[in-house]
């Protein structure tokens, strides 16, 4: 529209007094061969004088306008060519992006997502299995810890029993030692009593022998000297008394010895039985202690093995969980990158579509402008010979006042394939 206004202003500069009209056609009317368009349809010429000196100025102005319009058309053609090249380039990029988009769609990202989901499900399943195994191992560890605590309690109880048995055994040994000492003391006493009995018997025998010798000497002396009283009965009586006393003492000593020996024998037997029982119990406790020690060592080894296996399982579980987390993060990053790339391609495609739409609109606008300019320029060239210039008589009063009024009417007709598409009319008033 600016170019049209500039052209109209340029035309206004060389149009003389009067009216210039561009003949128009009715919309939809087709031009046949040999049809001439009248650019200015004037009223019938009045009997006046025609000034042909204005034709040269009009021709020069028209040529200048034609040159400027030709330069503008060349510039527009260059710009139009560059736009066409740009449009072709963008269309090629659009086709390439569309092909890439179709290729990406043909890859069926849903199946890829299904594959990722299947792999994620498998990884989650393995993670759940590892978690279950870890929980099971923890339960087994707790059970073994409870068993170990029970065994340790039993070991403590057995240790206490062993200590008690050892204390009892020490007491029994002390009692046995005391009984042995008492037995030895009694044996020494018995030996001393036996020696004393033997000594007393020996003394008694010597006394009896001495008495017998004395009795024999006295009897002989009595027999020799005089008849003395009978001492044999007295000696026999004394002898009988002494023998009875010795026998009684011997019997009492033997009875006392037998009773003491029986008591000591019974005490020794009891102590020996208790000692044997204590030794048997100590041996049983020792065997139980050895068995429990072996069980404890076995359980300790089993516990250490299970703890080592549990640590290995936990470390492997941590490593596998870390690898699964890394794989999951990597898959999520790949999915996110694919989504971002897809969004970027879609955004680029949308931008290219917007650019293409804008270029299509601009091309259509330029095409319409070019067609309008071509139609507008072609009509005056073809009908330049039909221009009719007339000079009207001016009012004396108006001339004397030094003012000249001009009415310029510009009628533009747009044609395509010989058909009138658009017709416009502009009227300008100028005072000189």
UniProtKB/Swiss-Prot annotation:
Name the family the entry cites. Answer: Belongs to the intermediate filament family.
* Principal subcellular localisation of the protein: cytoplasm
UniProt-annotated stretches for the region Coil 1A: 73-104
- Which Pfam families does the record cross-reference, listed alphabetically? Filament, Filament_head
Carrying Phosphoserine, the residues are 13, 38, 82, 323, 385
Subunit (UniProt):
Interacts with SYNM.
Q: Point out residues bearing the modification Omega-N-methylarginine.
A: 12
Fetch the Gene3D superfamilies from UniProt: 1.20.5.170, Single helix bin, Vasodilator-stimulated phosphoprotein
Task: Quote the InterPro entries the UniProt record gives.
Answer: IF_conserved, IF_rod_dom, Intermed_filament_DNA-bd, Intermediate_filament
The annotated region (Linker 12) lies at 215-230
Q: Where is this region: Linker 2?
A: 253-256
Any idea which UniProt keywords this protein has? Citrullination, Coiled coil, Cytoplasm, Disease variant, Intermediate filament, Leukodystrophy, Methylation, Phosphoprotein
Q: Provide a Gene Ontology MF annotation, just one.
A: identical protein binding
In its UniProt entry, what is this protein called? Answer: Glial fibrillary acidic protein
Medical condition linked: Alexander disease: A rare disorder of the central nervous system. The most common form affects infants and young children, and is characterized by progressive failure of central myelination, usually leading to death within the first decade. Infants with Alexander disease develop a leukodystrophy with macrocephaly, seizures, and psychomotor retardation. Patients with juvenile or adult forms typically experience ataxia, bulbar signs and spasticity, and a more slowly progressive course.
Annotated region described as Coil 1B, given as residue ranges: 116-214
| Modifications after synthesis and translation | Phosphorylated by PKN1.
The PTM Phosphothreonine maps to: 7, 110, 150, 383
Residue ranges constituting the IF rod domain according to the UniProt record: 69-377
């Amino acid at each position: 529209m600016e170019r049209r206004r500039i052209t109209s202003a340029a035309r206004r500069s060389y149009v003389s007094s009067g009216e210039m009209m561009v003949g128009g056609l009715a919309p939809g009317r087709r031009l046949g061969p040999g049809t001439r368009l009248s650019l200015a349809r004037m009223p019938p010429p009045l009997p006046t004088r025609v000034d042909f000196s204005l034709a040269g100025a009009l021709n020069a102005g028209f040529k200048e306008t034609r040159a400027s319009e030709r330069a503008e058309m060349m510039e527009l053609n260059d710009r139009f060519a560059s736009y066409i090249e740009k449009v072709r380039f963008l269309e090629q990029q659009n086709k390439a992006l569309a092909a890439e988009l179709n290729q990406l769609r043909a890859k069926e990202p849903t199946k890829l997502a299904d594959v990722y989901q299947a792999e994620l499900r498998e990884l989650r399943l393995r993670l759940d299995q590892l978690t279950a195994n870890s929980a099971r191992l923890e339960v087994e560890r707790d059970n073994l810890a409870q068993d170990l605590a029970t065994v340790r309690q039993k070991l403590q109880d057995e240790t206490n029993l062993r200590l008690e048995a050892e204390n009892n055994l020490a007491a029994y040994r002390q009692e046995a030692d005391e009984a042995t000492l008492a037995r030895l003391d009694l044996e020494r006493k018995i030996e001393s009593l036996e020696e004393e009995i033997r000594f007393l018997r020996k003394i008694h025998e010597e006394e009896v022998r001495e008495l017998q010798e004395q009795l024999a000497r006295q009897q002989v002396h009595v027999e020799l000297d005089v008849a003395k009283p009978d001492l044999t009965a007295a000696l026999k009586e004394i002898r009988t008394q002494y023998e009875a006393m010795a026998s009684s003492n011997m019997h009492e000593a033997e009875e006392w010895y037998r009773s003491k020996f029986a008591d000591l024998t019974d005490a020794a037997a009891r102590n020996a039985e208790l000692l044997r029982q204590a030794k048997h119990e100590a041996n049983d406790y020792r065997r139980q202690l050895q068995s429990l020690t072996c069980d404890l060592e076995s359980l300790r080894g089993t516990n250490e093995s299970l703890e080592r296996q549990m640590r290995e399982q936990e470390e492997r579980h941590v490593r596998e969980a870390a690898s699964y987390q890394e794989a999951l993060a990597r898959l999520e990053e790949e999915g996110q990158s694919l989504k971002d790339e897809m969004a970027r391609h879609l955004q680029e495609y949308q931008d290219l579509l917007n650019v293409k739409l804008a270029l299509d609109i601009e091309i259509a606008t330029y095409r319409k402008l070019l067609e309008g300019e071509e139609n507008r320029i072609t009509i005056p060239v073809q009908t330049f010979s039909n221009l009719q210039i007339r000079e009207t008589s001016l009012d004396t009063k108006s001339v004397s006042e030094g003012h000249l009024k001009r009415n310029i009417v510009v009628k533009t007709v747009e044609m395509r394939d010989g058909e009138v598409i658009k017709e416009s009319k502009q009227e300008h008033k100028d005072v000189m």
